[in-house]
A protein has these predicted regions:
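Short, charged low-complexity intrinsically disordered segments located at boundaries
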Residues: 88, 204, 225-228, 265-274, ...
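Short, surface-exposed acidic
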Residues: 250-254, 303-305
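Nucleotide-sugar donor-binding/catalytic module of glycosyltransferases
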Residues: 1-238, 242-248, 252, 375-404
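P-loop NTPase catalytic cores that bind/hydrolyze ATP
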Residues: 240-241, 252-276
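Short amphipathic alpha-helical coiled-coil/interface segments
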Residues: 49, 260-264, 287-295
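Basic, ligand-binding patches in group-transfer machinery
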Residues: 275-451
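A broadly tuned preference for mixed-charge, low-complexity surface segments
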Residues: 174, 180-184, 255-264, 317-326
Length: 451
């Protein structure tokens, strides 16, 4: 255990650099955690802030015994070294990493820890929300859509699509036994750490309880925001080089590579207006060729990592020609929502003739309001659901507009692709709301008002 006495249940490690504006809220949320403070410690590691952050930390450390603050001798340039030092100094059985501008729910982590303790879990996942100026949105819903235990962490579907610290608790022993540390990178250091951590954890719990809030308000500047698309892509290439050589379960490795190919390159590099507007597209293409070469050198075919039909079609257009690829990206960004048709109760995308060599894209689930019906002396709102045969409806919710943290589960009946909701049930504390269909465990679709 690294020579330390493990006498706390949970250690909260927070790296800090010039976050004076946000620290009070972050620290207060830790103070407000519904847990005996003798069982937890909060370790704040300051990366030689040039504002008043360290003085704020010292004030809280003087006032609360469970709060510690450490300052590095010189600025390290990123969160990796402060986090590693915090983990090294921690005395908790479990650790969670918190960003200094974020905040926690009072009951979320305490309840998740109890759940992990009861079931002997190595890692736990709770629901996180990204707070932006105009809205609040769920983060990584695939890791926190229900209460469940006894899960194999790296087998949770899409788990590697969310490789940041938000909403995660893990055993300290996993990082020590496998020497898992954060790498000192300007971007993507989380991917390497959590990819290895999740892959080498043996058991997991998840909860749909709210645990973590991510600060993405416009007045919050981070290294991630300051890193442009090309620079991020180059960091992701370095991450791919490291990950593909790691000793990980083969299934986990393939899921991680799939995430890098689909999300970090096809989605976040190519399917963007900035790519179409670029006067130097060869830079983008050269990076993607390097990705393919890295994958090929290790005995894989990039098509083995394409799971989403949208991205698969993009890659096939890329193979056809760069001109077709750029036309396909333009279609997906500007025209895809305008060209649809219904066949066999499934919504299809109507491609231009130039893409007739590509399989037709279809939507898993689309729901449309079909009016108010009066039946058996009761008013019902009727929703028609267009869906693939293998799509399973899981539930119906009211979700506050622009705030996914506020929601209400509805009772419903479903017959022949029609969902029936009692009109009197459609209220959400006087908020304006959307009706949302939950399907295939964690996926969701907002109901359209009309065709």
């Amino acid at each position: 255990m690294g020579g330390l006495t493990i006498n706390k249940l949970i250690s909260i490690v927070v790296s800090v650099y010039n976050k004076e504006k946000f620290l009070d809220k972050c620290i207060q949320s830790i103070i407000d955690l519904n847990r005996d403070k003798s069982q937890l410690e909060a370790i704040f590691v300051d990366d030689v802030s040039t504002d008043n952050s360290y003085n704020i930390l010292k004030k809280y450390a003087d006032e609360y015994d469970f709060i510690r603050c450490i300052q590095l001798e010189e600025n390290s340039g990123g969160p990796a070294d402060p986090r590693n030092l915090g983990i090294q100094e921690s005395k908790g059985k479990y650790i969670t990493i918190v960003d200094a501008d974020d905040w926690l729910e009072p009951n979320g982590y305490p309840n998740l820890i109890n759940q992990m303790e009861e079931h002997g879990s190595d890692i736990g996942f709770g629901q996180a929300f990204k707070n932006r100026n105009k809205d609040i949105v769920k983060v990584a819903n695939f890791a926190s859509y229900k209460k469940a235990n006894g899960l194999v962490p790296y087998e949770i579907y899409k788990i590697f699509r969310g490789m940041g610290p938000w909403g995660k608790i893990f055993k300290r022993s996993t990082t020590i036994d496998h020497n898992i540390k954060f790498r000192n990178l300007k971007f993507a250091e989380d991917k390497l750490f959590y990819a290895e951590l999740i892959s080498k954890s043996k058991s997991a719990s998840m909860t749909d309880e709210h645990v973590y809030h991510v600060n993405r308000y416009s007045d919050n500047i981070s290294l991630v925001k300051e890193t442009d698309d090309i620079e991020k892509a180059n960091f992701n290439i370095e991450v791919l080089k490291d990950l593909i050589k790691m000793d990980l379960p083969e299934y986990a490795k393939k899921q991680i590579i799939s995430r890098i190919v689909e999300m970090d390159f096809i989605s976040r590099v190519f399917i963007k207006k900035s790519f179409l507007k670029s006067n130097n597209k060869d830079v983008y293409y050269n990076m993607f060729e390097e990705v393919q070469n890295i994958i090929k050198e290790h005995g894989y075919d990039i098509e083995d990592f394409l799971e989403n039909e949208r991205y698969t079609n993009a890659f096939h257009a890329y193979q056809h020609s760069k001109e077709h690829f750029e036309e396909y990206i333009k279609f997906m960004l500007y025209n895809a929502h305008a060209h649809k048709y219904i066949k066999n109760n499934v919504v299809h995308f109507n491609y231009p003739d130039k893409f007739n060599y590509l399989p037709t894209l279809t939507s898993k689930c689309v729901a449309v309001h079909d009016g108010t019906h009066y039946m058996n002396e009761t008013f019902y709102e009727v929703l028609h659901v267009y869906k693939k045969p293998n799509t399973t409806i899981e539930g119906v919710e009211l979700v506050k507009i622009n705030d996914e943290s506020t929601r209400k589960t509805l009772k419903y009946e479903i017959h022949d692709n029609q969902i029936y909701l009692k009109t009197d049930d459609l209220h959400l504390d006087n908020y304006d709301f959307n009706i949302v269909i939950k399907f295939n465990d964690f996926e969701h679709s907002t109901v359209y008002a009309s065709h």
